[in-house]
């Protein structure tokens, strides 16, 4: 079987599996998720052994520490996967939910109901926990899933796929409801992106090059999880202790994730007091600073930033720093270099906070908080499949509801159109 025919067969089987899955009860879907959680707990040693194969290859290839962190399945990661499954079980099933109902003057009773999207293909990098998260959310929303993780996580994703398949089979649901592409060949992605006859939506989640590749080659609608060039703007008046804490958390808690801060913008009036303190905190946290000329004058140990730094998602302990004249210049910078992901203002001026909220168009705009809160769980939405930077269909964290669509149901008593 050629690669092209293998990928088409996987997509065809996913489409076939999606039909009965769309009408599966909430109890049935929750039972599958509980079985996956049980399988993860029982398969801990085997999962860790397969993950070690990926980690060894990553270290041998010189992968960065931040990327290795994303690739690692620790005890904590496994517990987080199981916790995530239980959280999805606890969420209400969106399928069949009536989002609106009304009666027309001619007596027609009209309702709008949530339905599964169908077959979702997800293409992502590094983090094998995404395999479990994506499978859980797609299944709970009644969708079949085709998953293609990064080749660097091949062994980890393969064992996770087996556990998911076993859980499906135990409950009497087709294993084809969740499939992980069984090959590392990048051409498999290209072939997958041509299966518009069977796949309804593609969700890429990874670096800029992956997103651009998917958008360029897909004949299927794409919901982008684009890069996170996230900003914190420190306004002319603010609580500087809070500002330092926010910036350290936003940059260092998990530097390799999409909602980490990449650029710090500082008002010129507060910069002489704030930046030396911030630089000291960054230095203690081993964060490399890359600054504009005005920043370098105040922080001699910083490296000079060039134009590419302002649009770079470092995913590492690096931050670009720019001193701006005022709020307007900060927002203009974000409009040019931001990625519509997450942007925050730290300020004591309510009018400036409101202007920032109304002007900046990112999927999460924050006031006096860390960028790290742009997350489905932290926002109280439950689990998420990613953070969409597309405005069509979904914008921001994508939970269960964002993995469904709607249909109209019209009930009459023999009415005909006049």
UniProtKB/Swiss-Prot annotation:
SUPFAM superfamilies: ALDH-like (SSF53720). The keyword Oxidoreductase applies. GO terms for cellular component: cytoplasm. It is found in: Cytoplasm. One of its GO terms (biological process) is L-proline biosynthetic process. Keywords: Amino-acid biosynthesis, Cytoplasm, NADP, Oxidoreductase, Proline biosynthesis. Pathway: Amino-acid biosynthesis; L-proline biosynthesis; L-glutamate 5-semialdehyde from L-glutamate: step 2/2. GO terms for molecular function: glutamate-5-semialdehyde dehydrogenase activity; NADP binding. Its EC number is 1.2.1.41. The keyword NADP applies. It catalyses: L-glutamate 5-semialdehyde + phosphate + NADP(+) = L-glutamyl 5-phosphate + NADPH + H(+). Pfam families: Aldedh. Belongs to the gamma-glutamyl phosphate reductase family. Catalyzes the NADPH-dependent reduction of L-glutamate 5-phosphate into L-glutamate 5-semialdehyde and phosphate. The product spontaneously undergoes cyclization to form 1-pyrroline-5-carboxylate. This is Gamma-glutamyl phosphate reductase.
